[in-house]
Each structure stands twice: as C-alpha cells, then as structure tokens.
C-alpha cells in the first residue's frame, strides 16, 4: 500500500476492492486483449455482480499461481488451452524454492529484536569439494512458542515451549529449485491444482548439513549452541510465498509465454509483471527482482503509450 497510496489522488487511478477477475477477454481474432470480466462480492447482502472493464493495455499481476490460473481459465475458440498458451507453457516451470526452517537452541536467552538484518551467502556457489550452488542462509525475523508447538512432541508443556522459544536462534535456509515443465499450475473443475516434485535435493541437503556443522562448531568454541538441538522443518507445497516461473519470459515463443518486455507472445497488449516471468529463481527472496522488473516494464509501457 505504501506504493499505491501516493497515486490514489490522481484522476486516472481507481482501486476497486472486493473484486475478482474471472476472465480475460480478447477481440474476435484473439490477437489483442479488450478487457477483463470482474466479479464483485457484497458479503453483507450475500450478493455478487459482474462487470467488464476495457483498456488498450491489460497488465496481470496476481502472483505466479493466480496469474497462470487466470490465463488457463480464459479459454476461447482461439485459445482452447488457455489465453496466451499456444506454447503450452502457461502454468509450467512452477518454482517456490527449497526452504527449511531450522532452530538452534542457545544456552543464553535470545532477546535480539532485529534478527532479520543479515544474510549468509558463503555457500551460495558451492565449496571447493562441491562446485555446485547450495543456497543462502538468513535469520528468521521473529519466533513464537506457537511456531514450535506445531513440531514439538505431543503434550509438550507450555513452559517448556516458552523456554525453548526464549533460547531459540532461528534460521531460514534456501536452495534453488530448478525449472521443471512437469511442476505446474493446473485448473481442474474450476479450482487450482499444484503439481510439484522436489528437485535439487542434493544441494539442499548439503546446505542443511553444512549449516548444522557450522552451528555445532560455534558451540564448541563458545558454548552458545551447547545443547546441539536443531529442530528442522522443510517447507512443503503449502508454503508458496516465493512462487514464480509459471509464465516464463524468453525470445522463443515455443518455449516461453512472454517476450523480454513481459508481453505475451500471442497478444499485442497483454503483460504479466509478477514473479511468473522468472525462467529460474536462484536462491534468494524474489521480491526485489519482481519490483525491479515491474519498474522496468512500466518504463517500457510509458514509452509505448507516448
């Protein structure tokens, strides 16, 4: 909202809430987008209404999962498999990082209020005996006993969870998951289905083992991690905060959905500017790259509309 508020007083900006885009509309030949169909909900009266918004240019930014789903739902005679999907690439190459939450327990209470202020990339490009990327490590910003409860043994008393929380030094580990066309977003019976098989697990497991070794050696040096207790939890398909890759950009219309300006190869005026455009995702948070790319595409659109 900090980015939206400064422009809300402009006459050419309108923000509609309680709205869900259900279909992207095209002209008769399917060469350009004419607008979007929107469903409005009124929870107070349990009513819905539908409206159509038109525009010379349509930009989709629903997140990699929902942007792909919207295109797949927007079927027509010209696009029976989904809009902008002549390549059959829409929804494919879904990525969200191999991630692991790891908690080390210290002999000292951890009262640091600014934990998420640094990152560790020492192993990002591998090691001398393992010349393959492994990933990044960073502290977790905050940690509560309720977060430990989900992974603690049954009937663990609350006071024990609080002690563990007070002594916790939590870490977040990320390794790149590789683009795989079989990892994908699909629309089945009107609902969204994610199909995903983890990959690059050798690098992921090595990063976890390597970091545990670092923590253990830190403990031997100064007793900070003397308990040698490490709670680990891999983040599975439900943790898709770093979703990307479902409408990859590229120069070949047969192997990508978008061109290098994030315009759909199949349509003259449809753009996608969320994490969908990633052809690969690296092993760091994608947010800043998504923002930078959106600004880049915005500059392109300004030039186009002059």
Indicate residue ranges for each PLM-predicted region.
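Short beta-strand to alpha-helix junction loop
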Residues: 1-8, 16-18, 199, 203
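Glycine-rich loop(s) and the adjacent beta-strand/alpha-helix scaffold that form part
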Residues: 10, 23-27, 36-114, 274, ...
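Short, conserved active-site loop motifs that form the nucleotide-linked donor/cofactor pocket
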Residues: 12-14, 270
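General small-molecule cofactor/ligand-binding pocket signal
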Residues: 14-16, 223-224
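Short loop/edge segments at beta-strand edges and connector loops
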Residues: 17-19, 40, 251
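A glycine-rich dinucleotide-binding beta-alpha-beta segment and adjacent secondary-structure elements
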Residues: 22-25, 35, 172, 199, ...
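FAD cofactor-binding and catalytic pocket of flavoenzymes
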Residues: 87-206, 240-245, 265, 272-279
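A conserved FAD-binding loop/helix module that cradles the flavin
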Residues: 280-301
């Amino acid at each position: 909202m900090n980015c939206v508020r400064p422009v809300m007083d402009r006459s050419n900006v309108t923000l509609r809430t309680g709205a869900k885009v259900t279909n992207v509309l095209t002209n008769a030949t399917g060469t350009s987008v004419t607008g979007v169909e929107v469903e409005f909900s009124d929870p107070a009266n349990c009513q819905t209404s539908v409206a159509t918004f038109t525009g010379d240019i349509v930009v989709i930014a629903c997140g990699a999962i929902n942007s792909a789903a919207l295109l797949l739902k927007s079927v027509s005679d010209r696009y029976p498999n989904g809009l902008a999907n002549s390549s059959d690439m829409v929804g494919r190459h879904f990525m969200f990082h191999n991630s692991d939450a790891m908690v080390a327990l210290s002999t000292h209470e951890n009262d640091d209020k600014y934990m998420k202020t640094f990152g560790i990339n020492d192993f990002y490009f591998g090691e001398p005996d393992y010349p393959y990327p492994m990933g990044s490590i960073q502290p977790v910003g905050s940690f509560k006993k309720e977060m430990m409860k989900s992974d603690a043994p049954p009937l663990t008393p609350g006071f024990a969870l609080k002690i563990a929380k007070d002594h916790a030094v939590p870490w977040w580990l990320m390794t790149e998951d590789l683009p795989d066309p079989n990892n994908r977003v699909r629309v089945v019976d009107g609902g969204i289905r994610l199909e995903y098989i983890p990959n690059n697990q050798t690098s992921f497991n090595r990063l976890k083992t390597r970091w545990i070794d670092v923590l253990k050696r830190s403990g031997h040096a100064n007793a900070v991690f003397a308990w040698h207790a490490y709670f680990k939890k891999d983040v599975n398909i439900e943790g898709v905060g770093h979703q990307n890759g479902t409408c990859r950009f590229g120069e070949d219309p047969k192997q990508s959905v978008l061109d290098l300006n994030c315009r759909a190869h199949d349509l003259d005026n449809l753009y996608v500017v969320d994490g969908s455009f990633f052809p690969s995702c690296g092993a760091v948070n994608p947010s800043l790259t998504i923002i930078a790319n959106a600004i880049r595409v915005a500059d392109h659109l300004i030039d186009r509309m002059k």
